[in-house]
Amino acid sequence: MAAKKEFNIFDHVLVPEHRILSEEEKEELLKKYRIRISQLPQIKASDPAVVALGAKPGDVIEIKRKSPTAGYYYYYRLVVED
């Protein structure tokens, strides 16, 4: 049987930077926007970026994307089960 090839998804030019927020950062985010965690957009636990990060359901992911006008902008996703 052939060996499985490993690929780091974050090395791809089209994949933005992702990171898992700490519990303190998560609480700050919810207070800043005056929202409940259930109001965050969702991302499935099977998403390749989520799998690569090792995130689990309930974690909040911060995604940093390049913007031609703003430099960078951030958006957040709640990891949910499939």
Curated annotation (Swiss-Prot):
Catalytic activity: RNA(n) + a ribonucleoside 5'-triphosphate = RNA(n+1) + diphosphate
The EC number(s) this enzyme carries: 2.7.7.6
Keyword Cytoplasm: yes
Alphabetical keyword list: Cytoplasm, DNA-directed RNA polymerase, Nucleotidyltransferase, Transcription, Transferase
Pfam families: RNA_pol_Rpb5_C
Biological-process GO terms, alphabetical: DNA-templated transcription
Cellular compartments annotated: Cytoplasm
InterPro entries (alphabetical): Arch_Rpo5/euc_Rpb5, RNA_pol_subH/Rpb5_C, RNA_pol_subH/Rpb5_CS, RPB5-like_sf
Any one of the GO CC terms: DNA-directed RNA polymerase complex
Assembly and binders: Part of the RNA polymerase complex.
Entry similarity comment: Belongs to the archaeal Rpo5/eukaryotic RPB5 RNA polymerase subunit family.
The name this protein goes by in its record: DNA-directed RNA polymerase subunit Rpo5
Provenance organism: Thermococcus kodakarensis (strain ATCC BAA-918 / JCM 12380 / KOD1) (Pyrococcus kodakaraensis (strain KOD1))
Organism lineage: Archaea, Methanobacteriati, Methanobacteriota, Thermococci, Thermococcales
Gene: rpo5
